[in-house]
């Protein structure tokens, strides 16, 4: 798949200089046309990581964490090749997004 067409939950390399994580997770669905994609950094685990806000991923037999709280929009030109898919972790990723966007516990009244 060409780097210009990343799909939802693809894990890709990037071309962002000075960025701390080796990979980005595509959070924006591929059917939404845009010149950028909403992504979350994928980094090595840090002490104190909370599973719901930093779900675990395994890429090439190495454990990483998705930094959902650090999601941002990145131009398509900054996205490089696909290295894996996080489809098997979709439930954990969506739970983290739900908590960030809707509060904890999910569905808690405002």
Segments and roles (model prediction):
Residues 1-7, 106-110:
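Intrinsically disordered, low-complexity and often Lys/Arg-enriched segments
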Residues 2-3, 11-57:
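Compact nucleic-acid interaction/catalytic patches
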């Amino acid at each position: 798949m060409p780097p210009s067409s990343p799909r939802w939950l693809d894990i890709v390399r990037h071309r962002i200089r000075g960025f701390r994580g080796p990979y980005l997770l595509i959070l924006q669905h591929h059917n939404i046309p845009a010149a950028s994609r909403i992504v979350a950094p994928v980094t090595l685990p840090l002490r104190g990581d909370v599973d719901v806000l930093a779900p675990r991923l395994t890429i090439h037999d190495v454990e990483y964490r998705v930094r959902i709280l650090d999601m941002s929009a990145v131009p398509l030109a900054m996205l490089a090749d696909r290295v894996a898919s996080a489809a098997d972790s979709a439930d954990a990723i969506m739970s983290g997004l739900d908590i960030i966007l809707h509060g904890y516990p999910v569905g808690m009244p405002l």
